[in-house]
């Protein structure tokens, strides 16, 4: 019987994490459970930095960006003896389960704790939208709004100077944020990690646009594909059009979460408590076709596939 649980945020922060913590805390207290917040993710779990939370601990948190519990990278958590210390710290406080809010690295930590006999529930908190078993992650839509606003501003100045603008978007190995922002922002060209990239092909497409009378253009590209400053120099040399690169960086992670992310985070947080009370452990929560679902966290990491949104790219190309 679950009586006490912990909650932590791990990895890169995302708008809506505070709303998710609030959902977990309020739902747990409503069900008569005690709940502890863990500071700075798995590092705080290892260092035994936890605090008991009440309803007032999460007051006025639903609209705040970031995570008030903090987050930290802690690669040492891969070591079994480190995780054993973390489990002992939780048992010392009488915790029966842990809710982990974060990305795929955070899920891996939850998976390993689950395999060591400590039940965890994972909630997808990342702007990258790269988590298996869910259509959308907490923070994705807020980050999308931030990126589109930046693209709109770049379009103003690009059109004024007949310039080609490259905008680098976060996402790591997933192009969802780039794709969605490119469609919403009317970008002329899209480069994502799921599709092989050739700078020569990109230049040819840009030249074709110029031949049709296009006086400016925006290229949306996912981070880590190439050096965007070098790409800008290459495009400018080949097209004789002024080209500038803008790296949006960590601004994409900040800001007050939008309504959808607040709702999604709240629903997922409350659902995590429902799952624990039903006796589930080692699960990760998702939303598919607007319905909350849960999957085995081991299967989600090791077996499940995350489909590429090829139809989004096809749509974008029709609108160039």
UniProtKB/Swiss-Prot annotation:
Matches recorded under InterPro entries: ATP_PFK, ATP_PFK_prok-type, PFKA_ATP_prok, Phosphofructokinase_CS, Phosphofructokinase_dom, PKF_sf
GO cellular component: a single term: 6-phosphofructokinase complex
Chain sites annotated for binding ATP: 12, 73-74, 103-106
Active site: 128
One of the protein's GO biological processes: fructose 6-phosphate metabolic process
Positions bound to Mg(2+): 104
Residues binding substrate, per UniProt: 126-128, 163, 170-172, 223, 244, 250-253
Subcellular location: Cytoplasm
Keyword tRNA processing among UniProt keywords: no
Pathway: Carbohydrate degradation; glycolysis; D-glyceraldehyde 3-phosphate and glycerone phosphate from D-glucose: step 3/4
Cofactor field: Mg(2+)
Subunit structure: Homotetramer.
UniProt protein name: ATP-dependent 6-phosphofructokinase
Organism from which the protein derives: Enterobacter sp. (strain 638)
Gene behind this protein: pfkA
